[in-house]
């Protein structure tokens, strides 16, 4: 499995800011969007382009355009919504699919509760977004679902990943690509990433 830890200074700086213990909901939300945007830039760097002639201000001009790439952005509810606007800034015409999965706090197992997948998913690249890749359970369940629907091309964008989650994802889906802002130390006894960001969903939505 291709794993890319984006080491751009802006990404590292913003993830560092997100680790502040008393960060406000507004600030955390802004940074989640910004880092999501920067990860999208990296994840789409292999898109092919083609030459197209358009009418410029001074007559015809040849420009580069992305070559027929159909994309669906797949936020995992609820925390994935915090990254969605940052991704869509670069691809405002992308379709959005939604998958609802929560992690049982006692068993740490993923529990699906909602899905709405775009049509022609088999023709699209899916960019699955979720702030945290901890145990990997929710991400694996989401990719299982997408593949059952016919999706053949999947990239995963997360803010912070634990080695345990990366290992589990690679074992289940070695054909996907993972882009993250930080690979952290690991999981604590409750299944949270350390040092991590805390509960990203609560911080994005202002709930506890």
From Swiss-Prot:
The lineage of its organism: Bacteria, Pseudomonadati, Pseudomonadota, Gammaproteobacteria, Aeromonadales. Pathway: Pyrimidine metabolism; UMP biosynthesis via salvage pathway; UMP from uracil: step 1/1. This is Uracil phosphoribosyltransferase. HAMAP family: Upp_B. InterPro entries: PRibTrfase_dom, PRTase-like, Upp_B, UPRTase/APRTase, Ura_phspho_trans. Its EC number is 2.4.2.9. GO terms for molecular function: GTP binding; magnesium ion binding; uracil phosphoribosyltransferase activity. NCBIfam families: PRK00129.1 (NF001097), upp (TIGR01091). The keyword Transferase applies. Transmembrane segments: none annotated. CDD domains: PRTases_typeI (cd06223). Disulfide bonds: none annotated. GO terms for biological process: UMP salvage; uracil salvage. The keyword Coiled coil does not apply. Its cofactor is Mg(2+). Allosterically activated by GTP. Uracil binds at residues 193, 198-200. Keywords: Allosteric enzyme, Glycosyltransferase, GTP-binding, Magnesium, Nucleotide-binding, Transferase. Belongs to the UPRTase family. 5-phospho-alpha-D-ribose 1-diphosphate binds at residues 78, 103, 130-138, 199. Binds 1 Mg(2+) ion per subunit. The magnesium is bound as Mg-PRPP. The gene is upp. It catalyses: UMP + diphosphate = 5-phospho-alpha-D-ribose 1-diphosphate + uracil. Catalyzes the conversion of uracil and 5-phospho-alpha-D-ribose 1-diphosphate (PRPP) to UMP and diphosphate.
């Amino acid at each position: 499995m291709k794993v890319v830890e984006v080491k751009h200074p802006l990404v590292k700086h913003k993830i560092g800011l997100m680790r502040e213990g008393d960060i406000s909901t507004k600030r955390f939300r802004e940074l989640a969007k910004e880092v999501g945007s920067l990860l999208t830039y990296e994840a789409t760097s292999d898109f092919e382009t083609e030459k197209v002639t358009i009418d410029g201000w001074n007559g015809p001009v040849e420009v580069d355009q992305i070559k027929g790439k159909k994309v669906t952005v797949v936020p995992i509810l609820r925390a994935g919504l915090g990254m969605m606007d940052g991704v869509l800034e670069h691809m405002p015409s992308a379709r959005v699919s939604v998958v609802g999965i929560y992690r049982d706090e006692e068993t740490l197992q993923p529990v699906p509760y909602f899905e709405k997948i775009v049509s022609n998913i088999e023709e699209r690249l899916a960019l699955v977004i979720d702030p945290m890749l901890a145990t990997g359970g929710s991400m694996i369940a989401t990719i299982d679902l997408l593949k059952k629907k016919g999706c053949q091309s999947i990239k995963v964008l997360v803010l912070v990943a634990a080695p345990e989650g990366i290992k589990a994802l690679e074992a289940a889906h070695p054909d996907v690509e993972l882009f993250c802002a930080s690979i952290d130390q690991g999981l604590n006894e409750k299944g949270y990433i350390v040092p991590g960001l805390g509960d990203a969903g609560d911080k994005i939505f202002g709930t506890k």
